[in-house]
Regions:
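Basic, helix-initiating cap at the start of DNA-binding domains
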Residues: 1-32, 36-41, 58
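Helix-turn-helix/winged-helix DNA-binding modules
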Residues: 30-31, 51, 141
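Short hydrophobic/aromatic patch on the recognition helix
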Residues: 43-53
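Alpha-helical DNA-contacting segments of helix-turn-helix folds
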Residues: 53, 57-67
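Hydrophobic alpha-helical connector segments
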Residues: 62, 72-98, 112-115
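Amphipathic C-terminal alpha-helical segment
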Residues: 98-103, 133, 150-169, 180-188
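Short linear capping/connector segments at secondary-structure termini
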Residues: 104-113
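Amphipathic alpha-helical packing segments from all-alpha helical-bundle domains
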Residues: 112-154, 161-162, 170, 174
Length: 188
């Protein structure tokens, strides 16, 4: 994934502030919300936003990269848990429910868009050890591959159809249950 150039600590802090603000604004108003709302929410000037990000797409890409980095950190925190694969899917479902606009944007991107290839690759690499452990422990069918992760993510994304946080959470849990049963070795 693209790494921003090394910045001064205060610039890094402002970048994180802007990303937090963008996540909150996009969650509340969608990814097409005016960028001025992000500036106001972050409590910075418009010039600060544009020093950090050239446009809306740069903000969205940075949010996606941050989301993937957090997924990777979550995977590492699970160490060698046999059910880490399903715990990662649960974490992904929670993120989808908490950031529906970003999740919807992520799902709408082309699988062939080179800007998102590093993020997609990191997701696959993040899930691979957990998938292999789950398969070794008989929790997941042997024919499930990392290339299936975007499909599973899309199934979890169906939770976005809920009209409230509670309904989205219920739908995400239902999707997780269906996925778990469908991936079980005895489901074939």
């Amino acid at each position: 994934m693209s790494q921003p150039p090394t910045k001064r600590p205060d610039a890094e802090t402002r970048r994180a502030q802007l990303l937090d603000a963008a996540d909150a604004v996009f969650t509340a108003h969608g990814v097409n919300a005016p960028l001025e709302l992000i500036v106001a929410h972050a409590g910075v000037g418009r010039a600060t936003l544009y020093r950090q990000f050239e446009d809306r797409n740069a903000i969205l890409l940075a949010l996606m990269e941050r989301s993937v980095q957090r997924l990777h950190a979550k995977a590492q925190s699970l160490n060698a848990a046999p059910d880490a694969f399903f715990l990662l899917l649960e974490y992904l479902a929670e993120r989808i429910v908490r950031s529906p606009a970003l999740s919807d944007y992520w799902r709408s991107t082309s699988l062939h868009d080179p800007r998102f290839a590093p993020a997609r690759q990191m997701v696959a690499e993040t899930f691979m050890p957990a998938l292999e452990r789950a398969q070794a422990h008989g929790l997941v069918r042997s024919d499930v591959q990392p290339r299936d992760i975007p499909l599973l993510s899309g199934m979890l994304g169906a939770a976005l159809r809920g009209s409230s946080d509670a309904e989205r959470l219920r739908l995400a849990r239902q999707a997780l249950s269906i996925i778990r049963r469908g991936l079980a070795p005895d489901a074939v």
